[in-house]
Swiss-Prot record:
The family this protein is said to belong to: Belongs to the universal ribosomal protein uL5 family.
Alphabetical keyword list: Ribonucleoprotein, Ribosomal protein, RNA-binding, rRNA-binding, tRNA-binding
Domain of life: Bacteria
Entries under HAMAP family matching the protein: Ribosomal_uL5_B
Organism: Streptococcus equi subsp. zooepidemicus (strain MGCS10565)
Example of a GO MF term: tRNA binding
Subunit structure: Part of the 50S ribosomal subunit; part of the 5S rRNA/L5/L18/L25 subcomplex. Contacts the 5S rRNA and the P site tRNA. Forms a bridge to the 30S subunit in the 70S ribosome.
Name of the molecule in the record: Large ribosomal subunit protein uL5
A Gene Ontology term for the protein's cellular component: ribosome
GO biological process, alphabetically ordered: translation
Amino acid sequence: MANRLKEKYTNEVIPALTEKFNYTSVMAVPKVEKIVLNMGVGDAVSNAKNLEKAAAELALISGQKPLITKAKKSIAGFRLREGVAIGAKVTLRGERMYEFLDKLVSVSLPRVRDFHGVPTKSFDGRGNYTLGVKEQLIFPEINFDDVDKVRGLDIVIVTTANTDEESRELLKGLGMPFAK
């Protein structure tokens, strides 16, 4: 069974983008390449259990085992040593990527309190979009009673688009609720 969002991309988004930007080939139409979820756990320096819980939550959200990220260099002000585990990240591609994006757009983002749309200023100039989520509780897989601490996470949507405008139209076509 093909994913609902992937079908929407193939049947609706590709023709709309081709018409708007006058692409000569279907392969020139921008597409979502990967989604990277990153959870920085600063308090993992003092308590390693926090990192394990954060990684478990990230695995629940993404459906994939996260990679533990380590500090690249020592920073005395943060009591940080090089090589200490300080976060977790997951890179989603293919079917899981579309499933996550569909869940994010249709279920998770509407659960955010006082939600008026995601900001349009978060594009990086090369067609990639970054979104910060303040609490992991907006995801349906996270059980409220099992959460020991509210943690945020970064979501980076990497597209093949060359400009921010193309990327914005792609994500809008996929249902991303941008603020007016």
